[in-house]
């Protein structure tokens, strides 16, 4: 599950050969919080009389490929029944014939089962949870408009809305755990090294300087309180009840959230870059933890993309601006050097405005010492320290963020398999998802430095090279960039396009540009 506990499987108290036994099974499953059902049969067992008719479960059937009894015939019959009744179901059928006394699960069937189970468990975990909007729409970004109907009808998620003044109320009235604040602040001061100050030496106009109401030397104190409060709003905190704040202690039953930030907040208060980065990371001052999908600029559709990615992988989702396509010729013109390796066909500059999960540094190591992104429960103390050491925190550019704050600054210095994705909503079609598998690229320092300094070098950079097919949106790297459906995207460690497609089929999300 998302929290790292093993997935629980329950078995029907009886085999199912009639409607009565199907009802007995359903009654039992209803007491066990079952979100998905897998029926397994080596034989014929009466199609629509035994099928799972519960519209709230994700369904699959494995029909045994054998000759003595017609398991495959039942599979075909019940899949036809599911289709007639409008109940989505997954069909599993082994490639090779098995003997009737063979109790093994063929490798191809096992792969389908695991992929189906990952998606089904993700669907189950989303139901009746909430997307918490902190603020509203950032800078006219369409993804920031929370589509409550989409979240309810496709995901089973409730949309919750919290005005930004609620955060200020809690800071002003001290509605947070003071002991946790001291612990978090101490960790931040010891581990979050400050990078360069882009504002140093600038003669900034009065309208900017007077907009910073929190003194620069108090930014980290404000940011620490802010981070604790955001976490409390999403998940609740029983410590608040002990302090007398019973309603605040409940939280919003969140599974995902986002913060508007720009510009109503950031024009006068420290930005949320640290908060967004550490929420989405696989660790904080308490050690390794479950990542929280948390969207910059409250881009709800990118937040949902983060949620889908982390639910099927257990890894930290990284939020990005899909900023620039660099062709090999353009790189050669600007730097005098050629792209090589995975980057040879060109690269896409993924760079968020100051906040990305620190796991995206690629500083965690696999068993061979290569940079990787791990399931959060597999992060070691060394991995965590490596990610911390690979990141510095540059003071926010006051010309962007008048209220100050600190931006997470790193460069993904590893060649890792990743999957980029994005959910969009298209009028007349509905929600669609784009998926691009590829690799992060570790460019030569000279190339990286010259390209990176052409944008904001206080922000986190990942160079992405998608896998190309020579066709359609994947004709070349330029085509991937040109066909991307929004200004934001998400990367997650590993090539998990097949897992995401399986999940999206359960959610009835259309697939484009695969």
Name every feature range the model reports, one short phrase each.
Residues 14-127, 140, 271:
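Cofactor- and metal-binding active-site motifs of prokaryotic enzymes
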Residues 283-445:
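C-terminal catalytic subdomain
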Residues 2-40, 44, 51, 56-58, ...:
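Alpha/propeptide regions of enzymes that mature by internal proteolysis
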Residues 1-15, 89-94, 157-162:
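Short beta-strand elements in bilobed, periplasmic/extracellular small-molecule ligand-binding domains
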Residues 405-495:
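C-terminal structured domain segments
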